[in-house]
Swiss-Prot record:
The keyword Membrane is assigned to this record: no
Localisation: Secreted
Organism lineage: Eukaryota, Metazoa, Chordata, Craniata, Vertebrata
Record protein name field: [Ser6, Val10, Asp11]-phyllokinin
Source organism of the structure: Agalychnis spurrelli (Gliding leaf frog)
GO molecular function per UniProt: toxin activity
Leader sequence segment: 1-22
Pfam families the UniProt entry points to: FSAP_sig_propep
InterPro entries the record matches: Frog_antimicrobial_propeptide (IPR004275)
Positions of the pro-segment in this chain: 23-51
Transmembrane segments: none
Tissue specificity note: Expressed by the skin glands.
Keywords, ordered alphabetically: Cleavage on pair of basic residues, G-protein coupled receptor impairing toxin, Secreted, Signal, Toxin, Vasoactive, Vasodilator
Family: Belongs to the frog skin active peptide (FSAP) family. Bradykinin-related peptide subfamily.
Cellular component, GO annotation: extracellular region
Length: 62
């Protein structure tokens, strides 16, 4: 009976370890995707606003 308990505990432990490794890899890929999206957004903003100070409006209001 103790052999079955040890085997069961070993299987559960190994399953838990593999599950946590998969979750960690999933988080890393999501973080990389988010960083790529942020880089793309910042590049778009750079293209939209050429060397103008913040708050500058090209329209003149009299």
């Amino acid at each position: 009976m103790s052999f079955l308990k040890k085997s069961l505990l070993l299987v559960l432990f190994l399953g838990l370890v593999s599950f946590s490794i998969c979750e960690e890899e999933k988080r890393e890929t999501e973080e990389e995707e988010n960083e790529d999206d942020m880089d793309e957004e910042s590049e778009e903003k750079k293209r939209e606003s050429p060397d103008r100070p913040p708050g500058f409006s090209p329209f003149r209001v009299d």
